[in-house]
């Protein structure tokens, strides 16, 4: 039997005004958890709600989406993710934070929601947590196939 406490991970999709959050308690499957809305670029507003989630689920690892350009260049959004990673490491030293390529995760999330006939308002409300779930699941699948490469 898996020890859920040791495998609890969060997937995060960081935007300018939203943070999509996904959870895996088993290290096998990701599920969308919630979207936190915050004032534009006020990332410090995310610390208290994340602290609550980290404590509640005894999170050991955070997989933070890393939005590289399609040509692999690092733009401003990736630099913001790098800054946010350092902030998380400083605030939650006991939690490992890993940057993970998130290219096209939001596009994929929107397609999933459209396929399920979600209305525009629901798509805008849910796309980030679905994207976070995709990011986390991609990481979990990679680790399953490459167990010696766990970051």
Curated annotation (Swiss-Prot):
Q: Where in the cell is the protein located?
A: Cytoplasm
UniProt-recorded Gene Ontology molecular function terms: nuclease activity
Q: Name one GO cellular component term.
A: cytosol
In its UniProt entry, the species of origin is given as: Aster yellows witches'-broom phytoplasma (strain AYWB)
Q: What class of enzyme is it?
A: hydrolase
Question: What PANTHER family does the entry give?
Answer: POLYNUCLEOTIDYL TRANSFERASE, RIBONUCLEASE H-LIKE SUPERFAMILY PROTEIN
State the HAMAP family in the record. Answer: Nuclease_YqgF (MF_00651)
What does the UniProt record say this protein does? Could be a nuclease involved in processing of the 5'-end of pre-16S rRNA.
Question: Which family, according to UniProt?
Answer: Belongs to the YqgF nuclease family.
Q: Which UniProt keywords apply?
A: Cytoplasm, Hydrolase, Nuclease, Ribosome biogenesis
Disulfide bond annotation, renumbered to this chain:
none
From the Swiss-Prot or TrEMBL record, give the protein name.
Answer: Putative pre-16S rRNA nuclease
EC numbers for this chain: 3.1.-.-
Provide the GO biological process annotations. Answer: rRNA 5'-end processing
